[in-house]
């Protein structure tokens, strides 16, 4: 049994799925007597929840681990663990590169951490728990090795008490040639709608006003149960009825599964956010084919025009990879044109990074020079920033409803007792809004009038309601 006086520090990088995983790991560790601390120096257990989507993210993790070598030498009683996608991908490599690490835990084995800790602290040596690889057995067997322990939750680990992530799907079966996720997260599996709705009710009871549904291709969600099949639209309809929830968001979407039925459901359910993150990755059919994305630009535009028709108020964002294998200047300019046509709310733009274990690493040549990747990255960012600012400027003078998240990063550095600080929040379309207010407004839905904008932020003020005195019957106005 784990001692009841242990402390844990956790560092999380990567996607929202990792943030949720960290919340659940901490909830589990608290049940075993651990308390959370803010710095590595205070901790008996140091956990690093890692990302493998790009090489840079992995190298940053190895660099952070390297800084712990002396700490471990001075304090051998401390336990160091690496969890998440890099743990599943690199496995024994982590022990070779950082031999002072005690535990390596893949994202499908996080429930094993307490038992692994018991073994480490009782002198049984280094521990590793990872899921089966795609070729290590039948898909059903491999899928079972990628377990989650939803809905084990800890509200104190969330970015705010009134916003929560809810996993509805794990894994991915798309096998894009550049991506490690099908290997690190395993086969695509949808949780049962009953589990999801039950967990959402718990989150609402804990004070969550907004939930964000998570999946690698979240709009592909399907679950077949004894009462038939539930798709994403059907799930949203069930979640919409939960008392206390004000907003429902979901990320990330796959273009070919953005159906008319789903869009009509979003349109007809007021709580569901019309913010749609639908990665295009490239504007070139040739590049998309090498990426094995499963659609053409004509397919993407058919989907986009469907959004414009059914849900004209939607804000759509995208992802782009620049410098993918064989990308020419002409290919790249097609990505520029796609952004200019679609006028995305924002785009997450990345330089291609070779990932060991992917089809691209095995079969394609990383032939775009690093400096060309950087130049294309900067150019595409500039185009997107210009478009984002132009479209944000159209909102000046409008009033938007904002879920106030708390003090902005700027305000965090200001006097904690200041009566007025810069607050931040988001609209239902996921636009960031800042305004002067006070800390008590966190968790409220407020009307904010927009006075100014940047590419990424709306700047406003709390809308005041004018009170007009009509006088009282029988009373003459004072002179």
From Swiss-Prot:
Principal location class: cytoplasm
E.C. number(s) listed in UniProt: 2.8.4.3
TRAM domain mapped to chain residues: 393-464
PROSITE patterns: MTTASE_N (PS51449), MTTASE_RADICAL (PS01278), RADICAL_SAM (PS51918), TRAM (PS50926)
The protein's required cofactors: [4Fe-4S] cluster
Keyword Coiled coil: no
Domain MTTase N-terminal: 6-122
Binding residues annotated for [4Fe-4S] cluster 1, in chain numbering: 15, 51, 85
Protein purpose: Catalyzes the methylthiolation of N6-(dimethylallyl)adenosine (i(6)A), leading to the formation of 2-methylthio-N6-(dimethylallyl)adenosine (ms(2)i(6)A) at position 37 in tRNAs that read codons beginning with uridine.
Subunit structure and binding partners: Monomer.
Protein name: tRNA-2-methylthio-N(6)-dimethylallyladenosine synthase
Species assigned in the record: Rhodopirellula baltica (strain DSM 10527 / NCIMB 13988 / SH1)
Classification of source organism: Bacteria, Pseudomonadati, Planctomycetota, Planctomycetia, Pirellulales
């Amino acid at each position: 049994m784990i001692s009841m006086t242990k402390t844990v520090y956790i560092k999380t990088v990567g996607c929202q799925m990792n943030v949720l995983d960290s919340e659940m790991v901490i909830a589990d560790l608290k049940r075993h007597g651990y308390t959370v601390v803010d710095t590595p120096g205070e901790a008996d257990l140091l956990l690093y929840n890692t990302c493998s989507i790009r090489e840079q993210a992995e190298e940053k993790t190895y660099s952070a681990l390297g800084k712990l070598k002396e700490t471990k030498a001075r304090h051998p009683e401390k336990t160091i663990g690496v969890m998440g996608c890099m743990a599943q991908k690199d496995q024994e490599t982590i022990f070779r590169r950082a031999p002072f690490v005690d535990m390596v835990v893949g994202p499908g084995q996080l429930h094993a951490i307490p038992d692994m800790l018991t073994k480490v602290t009782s002198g049984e040596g280094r521990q590793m728990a990872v899921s089966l690889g795609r070729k290590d057995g039948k898909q059903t067997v491999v899928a079972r090795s990628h377990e989650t322990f939803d809905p084990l939750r800890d509200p104190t680990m969330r970015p705010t008490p009134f916003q929560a992530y809810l996993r509805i799907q794990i894994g991915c079966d798309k096998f894009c040639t550049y991506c490690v996720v099908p290997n690190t997260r395993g086969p695509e599996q949808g949780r049962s709608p009953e589990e999801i709705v039950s967990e959402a009710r718990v989150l609402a009871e804990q004070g969550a006003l907004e939930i964000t549904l998570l999946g690698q291709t979240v709009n592909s969600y399907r679950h077949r149960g004894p009462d038939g099949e539930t798709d994403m639209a059907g799930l949203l309809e069930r979640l919409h009825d939960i008392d206390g929830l004000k907003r429902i968001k979901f990320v990330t979407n796959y273009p070919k599964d953005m159906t008319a039925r789903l869009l009509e459901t979003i349109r007809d359910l007021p709580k569901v956010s019309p913010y749609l993150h639908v990665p295009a990755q490239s504007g070139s059919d040739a590049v998309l084919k090498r990426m094995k994305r499963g659609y053409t630009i004509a397919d993407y535009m058919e989907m986009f025009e469907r959004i414009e028709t059914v849900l004209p108020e939607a804000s759509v964002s995208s992802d782009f990879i620049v410098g993918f294998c064989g990308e020419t200047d002409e290919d790249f300019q097609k990505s520029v044109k796609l952004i200019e046509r679609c006028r995305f709310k924002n785009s997450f733009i990345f330089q291609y990074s070779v990932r060991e274990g992917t089809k691209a690493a095995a079969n394609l040549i990383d032939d775009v020079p690093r400096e060309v990747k950087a130049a294309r990255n900067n150019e595409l960012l500039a185009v997107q920033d210009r478009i984002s600012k132009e479209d944000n400027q159209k909102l000046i003078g409008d009033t938007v409803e904002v879920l106030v998240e708390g003090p902005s990063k700027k305000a965090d550095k200001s006097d904690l007792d200041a009566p007025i600080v810069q607050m931040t929040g988001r609209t239902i379309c996921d636009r960031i809004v800042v305004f002067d207010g006070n800390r008590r407004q966190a968790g409220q839905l407020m009307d904010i009038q927009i006075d100014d904008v940047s590419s990424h932020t709306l700047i406003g003020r709390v809308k005041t309601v004018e009170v007009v005195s009509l006088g009282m019957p029988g009373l003459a106005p004072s002179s």
